[in-house]
From Swiss-Prot:
Biased composition regions of type Basic residues, renumbered to the chain: 26-44
Organism: Mus musculus
Entries under InterPro entries matching the protein: PDE6_gamma, PDE6_gamma_sf
Stretches for region Disordered: 1-55
Species lineage: Eukaryota, Metazoa, Chordata, Craniata, Vertebrata
Name by which UniProt lists this protein: Retinal rod rhodopsin-sensitive cGMP 3',5'-cyclic phosphodiesterase subunit gamma
Gene behind this protein: Pde6g
Gene Ontology molecular-function annotations: 3',5'-cyclic-GMP phosphodiesterase activity; cGMP binding; spectrin binding
Any matching Pfam family: PDE6_gamma
Length: 87
Protein backbone atom coordinates (compact mmCIF):
# COMPACT_ATOMS: atom_id res chain seq x y z
CA UNK A 1 0.00 0.00 0.00
CA UNK A 2 1.06 3.54 -0.77
CA UNK A 3 0.71 5.89 2.23
CA UNK A 4 1.65 9.10 0.39
CA UNK A 5 -1.18 11.35 -0.75
CA UNK A 6 -1.56 11.68 -4.50
CA UNK A 7 0.30 14.66 -5.97
CA UNK A 8 -1.91 16.88 -8.06
CA UNK A 9 -0.92 19.61 -10.44
CA UNK A 10 -0.42 22.95 -8.74
CA UNK A 11 -1.27 25.84 -11.03
CA UNK A 12 -0.50 29.43 -10.35
CA UNK A 13 -3.55 31.67 -10.41
CA UNK A 14 -1.52 34.78 -11.27
CA UNK A 15 0.09 33.63 -14.49
CA UNK A 16 -1.85 33.67 -17.75
CA UNK A 17 -0.48 31.45 -20.47
CA UNK A 18 -1.05 32.24 -24.12
CA UNK A 19 -2.30 35.82 -23.69
CA UNK A 20 -1.25 38.68 -25.96
CA UNK A 21 2.13 40.16 -25.13
CA UNK A 22 2.43 43.96 -25.48
CA UNK A 23 5.60 45.92 -24.86
CA UNK A 24 5.37 48.28 -21.89
CA UNK A 25 5.71 51.96 -22.68
CA UNK A 26 7.41 54.43 -20.37
CA UNK A 27 5.99 57.79 -19.33
CA UNK A 28 5.43 60.35 -22.10
CA UNK A 29 8.32 62.71 -22.75
CA UNK A 30 7.64 66.42 -23.03
CA UNK A 31 9.84 68.91 -24.82
CA UNK A 32 10.28 72.25 -23.11
CA UNK A 33 10.02 75.28 -25.35
CA UNK A 34 12.87 77.75 -25.37
CA UNK A 35 10.65 80.80 -25.86
CA UNK A 36 7.63 81.84 -23.86
CA UNK A 37 4.39 82.70 -25.59
CA UNK A 38 1.85 84.88 -23.84
CA UNK A 39 -1.77 85.38 -24.74
CA UNK A 40 -1.62 89.03 -23.77
CA UNK A 41 1.07 91.60 -24.41
CA UNK A 42 3.68 92.16 -21.70
CA UNK A 43 3.55 95.48 -19.87
CA UNK A 44 5.51 98.44 -21.16
CA UNK A 45 8.31 100.02 -19.19
CA UNK A 46 7.58 103.39 -17.71
CA UNK A 47 6.34 104.77 -14.48
CA UNK A 48 2.78 106.01 -14.48
CA UNK A 49 2.24 109.28 -12.69
CA UNK A 50 5.89 110.02 -11.94
CA UNK A 51 7.18 113.52 -12.54
CA UNK A 52 7.10 116.97 -11.02
CA UNK A 53 4.22 116.14 -8.67
CA UNK A 54 6.57 114.81 -5.97
CA UNK A 55 7.53 117.46 -3.38
CA UNK A 56 11.23 118.29 -3.50
CA UNK A 57 11.74 116.68 -6.93
CA UNK A 58 10.56 119.57 -9.13
CA UNK A 59 13.92 120.34 -10.71
CA UNK A 60 14.70 116.81 -11.87
CA UNK A 61 12.10 116.55 -14.61
CA UNK A 62 10.60 113.36 -15.98
CA UNK A 63 13.61 112.22 -18.05
CA UNK A 64 15.27 110.07 -15.40
CA UNK A 65 17.35 106.95 -15.82
CA UNK A 66 15.78 103.89 -14.29
CA UNK A 67 18.34 102.10 -12.18
CA UNK A 68 16.18 99.32 -10.83
CA UNK A 69 13.48 97.39 -12.73
CA UNK A 70 11.13 97.88 -9.76
CA UNK A 71 11.10 101.61 -10.58
CA UNK A 72 10.17 100.98 -14.20
CA UNK A 73 7.32 98.63 -13.29
CA UNK A 74 6.16 100.10 -9.98
CA UNK A 75 2.60 100.40 -11.28
CA UNK A 76 2.34 96.59 -11.53
CA UNK A 77 1.86 93.95 -8.88
CA UNK A 78 4.58 91.40 -8.15
CA UNK A 79 2.60 88.49 -9.63
CA UNK A 80 2.18 90.44 -12.88
CA UNK A 81 5.95 90.93 -13.15
CA UNK A 82 6.47 87.21 -12.57
CA UNK A 83 3.83 86.32 -15.16
CA UNK A 84 5.79 88.02 -17.92
CA UNK A 85 9.22 86.86 -16.77
CA UNK A 86 10.44 90.29 -15.69
CA UNK A 87 11.49 89.00 -12.30
Amino acid sequence: MNLEPPKGEIRSATRVIGGPVTPRKGPPKFKQRQTRQFKSKPPKKGVQGFGDDIPGMEGLGTDITVICPWEAFNHLELHELAQYGII
